[in-house]
């Protein structure tokens, strides 16, 4: 979910989102529908033979052969979307240190080196972190518990490293109650125990 937001706000402008093309006497922005599809890497393999992909050839010519439009064509035609998302994921991991990072991706004619700050990330995912906080408070209310009644909270998975997520948990439960361990493997281990 967070990776999809990073893709939309930080990466798709390198792939032509926002580029305009000439239509008679008007400049029109390329429709964003293809870029919305890119937010879901697991479905992007279907784009290669799609009408959306073919439309990018037209937009490429109408935009004066804009190289950003060519980037999205290269990305889709060579099934590079998953690799791009790995770069996005790495930038998210880097941000968990609280330091600035870059989203780096190099394939053929695509050269993306997009600066990315923790503050930008917090803004991009704010609507999701607001929902996370709302759900936590709702669960506590439904269970008729106060945060003070909880002895410890065990967090795991990649999102548990995201600073805005941790800040919510610290604010609700207190930093001293938050426990973690084997962040990337404990979810899979727990699932394996259920079989």
Region spans (language model):
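Short glycine-rich phosphate-binding loop at a beta-alpha junction
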Residues: 19-27, 140-157
């Amino acid at each position: 979910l967070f990776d999809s937001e990073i893709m939309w706000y930080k990466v798709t402008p390198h792939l032509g989102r926002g580029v305009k093309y000439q239509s008679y006497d008007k400049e029109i922005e390329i429709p964003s529908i293809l870029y919305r599809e890119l937010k879901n890497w697991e479905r992007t393999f279907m784009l290669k033979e799609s009408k959306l992909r073919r439309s990018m050839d037209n937009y490429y010519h109408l935009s004066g052969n804009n190289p950003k439009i060519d980037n999205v064509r290269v990305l889709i035609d060579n099934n590079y979307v998953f690799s791009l998302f790995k770069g996005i994921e790495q930038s998210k991991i880097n941000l968990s240190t609280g330091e600035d990072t870059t989203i780096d991706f190099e394939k053929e004619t695509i050269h993306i080196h997009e600066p990315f700050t923790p503050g930008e990330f917090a803004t991009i995912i704010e609507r999701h972190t607001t929902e996370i906080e709302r759900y936590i408070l709702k669960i506590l209310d439904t269970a008729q518990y106060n945060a003070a009644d909880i002895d410890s909270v065990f967090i795991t998975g990649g999102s548990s490293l995201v600073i805005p997520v941790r800040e919510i948990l610290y604010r609700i439960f207190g930093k001293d109650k938050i426990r973690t361990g084997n962040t990337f493997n404990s979810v899979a281990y727990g699932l394996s125990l259920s079989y």
